[in-house]
From Swiss-Prot:
Organism per entry: Homo sapiens (Human)
Listed result of changing A545V: In a primary colorectal cancer
Binding-site list for Zn(2+) 2: C515, C518, H536, C540
Protein name (database record): Deformed epidermal autoregulatory factor 1 homolog
Mapped zinc finger ranges (MYND-type): 504-540
Disorder cited: Vulto-van Silfout-de Vries syndrome: An autosomal dominant disorder characterized by intellectual disability, poor speech, motor delay, and autistic features. Most patients have additional non-specific features, including hypotonia and gait abnormalities, seizures, which may be refractory, high pain threshold, and sleep disturbances.
Amino acid sequence: MEDSDSAAKQLGLAEAAAVAAAAAVAAAAAAAAGGEAEEPVLSRDEDSEEDADSEAERETPRVTAVAVMAAEPGHMDMGAEALPGPDEAAAAAAFAEVTTVTVANVGAAADNVFTTSVANAASISGHVLSGRTALQIGDSLNTEKATLIVVHTDGSIVETTGLKGPAAPLTPGPQSPPTPLAPGQEKGGTKYNWDPSVYDSELPVRCRNISGTLYKNRLGSGGRGRCIKQGENWYSPTEFEAMAGRASSKDWKRSIRYAGRPLQCLIQDGILNPHAASCTCAACCDDMTLSGPVRLFVPYKRRKKENELPTTPVKKDSPKNITLLPATAATTFTVTPSGQITTSGALTFDRASTVEATAVISESPAQGDVFAGATVQEASVQPPCRASHPEPHYPGYQDSCQIAPFPEAALPTSHPKIVLTSLPALAVPPPTPTKAAPPALVNGLELSEPRSWLYLEEMVNSLLNTAQQLKTLFEQAKHASTYREAATNQAKIHADAERKEQSCVNCGREAMSECTGCHKVNYCSTFCQRKDWKDHQHICGQSAAVTVQADEVHVAESVMEKVTV
C-alpha cells in the first residue's frame, strides 16, 4: 500500500512539473514573438524543460504555473522532478485531477507582491481544501519573492494582509467573484475579535451558573425591557442578574457575559445598544404593540473640576548663586525665586585687587545667566534696595542690584559700590561708560560717615523715649485695674446690704413691696402685711415724723459743714 502511494505521489509530481513547464514556455513564446505563431513546446524531454526555464527567467513578467493535486493534504507539494513517461502521465491523470494556479509578478522588484487566480478551482475536492488551505511556493519560484496564497473551495482568492492588488489582471482566465465578508469584517472597527454569530438577533448569555437567551430587539435600558428568556420566563437584565445572585453588584453590563466577555464589551463595540432610562419605546414598556420614540443610552465622561491641580508638575525656580571673583574670601550671594538675597560667609575686599571684577551667576540645573561688567567705583555705600528684586533674574532683562552696606572694618576707606548688570547667557557685554552714583539716601537723609552715627543715635533716643512712654502707660493701666477691683468689691458689699434691708419683716424672705405710709417696712406679700399691721399701725405715723425731723436736722448740719469748708 505504501509503495502504491509513493508511486502515485511521484506520478502526480511529474505531471505537475510538466504542466508548469508547458505553461511557462507558452507564456515566454507569446511575449517574445508577439504576433507570430506559437511553437509547440509540449515535449516531455529534460532538454526542453531546461530551455523553457531559461527563457522564462529572461522574461520580465515571470509567469509560473503551480499544480495543485486533489489528493490527500499531506501530498500537496510543488517542485521540479524527473518527468515520467506517457504511461505514467496517463496513470496520474486517472488518479487525480490537476488544478492550475497561475501566479504573476505584477509589481516592482522590491515590492514582492503577487496576485493569484484559480483557473479550475471547482475541481478541487472539498475534503482537501476544507475552509482555507495555504499553498507554499517551492523551488519553481524565486525564494526572494515567496508569498502566501489562500485558496477557497468556491474559487475565490483572499490576499493576506499587506499585499497589493494589481491595477488590471495580467493573466487571462475566468475570474470568480469574491466572497462577501462576514459581518465582523464589514464592521472592522471592533475592539475585540467576535464570532460572526455575535451579529445574530439572539445571543446566549450567562450570569454565574444561570444561562439564558438575549433578544436584541427587546433590549431596553437594563432595568426595563424583559429581553432575556430563561426557560419559559422573560427577565430584564437586572432581574436576570438578581436571579443569579448578583443583585448587590447593580451592574448588569459586567455581570452578564457572552462568549466569556461581559456585555459591556458588546456595548463598546456597538453591537448592543441599550436604551436610556427615560426611553418610552415598546421594548422598555414591555408592550410590543406600542410605538414610542427610542432614546439610546449615551455614555458620559466625568468632567474635571476646575480647582483640580494639573497632573504635570510645576517647575520650581531654583535659587541662583552669585560668586564674586576675584576676592580674598569666597562669598556667595543666593537669589531665591521670591527675590531675597542671602549671603554665605563674610564679604571682604582686597585693597590691592584689580578694579575690574567679574560676577558669575550659576543656576542649577538649567543653564544660568551670566552677569558681567561689575565695576568697583569710588562712591559712598548704598543701603539695600528692599532685598533685591521681587522676581528672579532671567536672560534678556536689564536690571541692577545694589549690595547692602557692611561694617566699616570690612570696607575700604573709598566705600566701593558693586553693581551687577544682567546680560543674556553666552553674550558679550557691550562697553558702557560708568557714571558716578549719587549719595545714598535713608529716609530722605544723605548717608555719610558722621551723619550715619547721628542717625543711629537719634534712632536709639527715639527707642528709649518710646520705651519710657510705654512703661508709664503700663503703670497707669495697672493702677486703673486696681481701682476697678476695689470699686467692684465696694459695689458688691453695698448691694448685699441693700438686699438684707429689703427682706420681709414678718417672715424674713425677699421683700416685694413696702409700706405706703412710712416707706420703712418691707413685706413679701399682702398676707405678711395684714399679719404685721396690728403692731405696725401704732408706730407707722410717729416713726415717719421722727425720721423726717431727724433727717432735716442732719441735713442742716451737713450744709453748715460744707459752708465752713
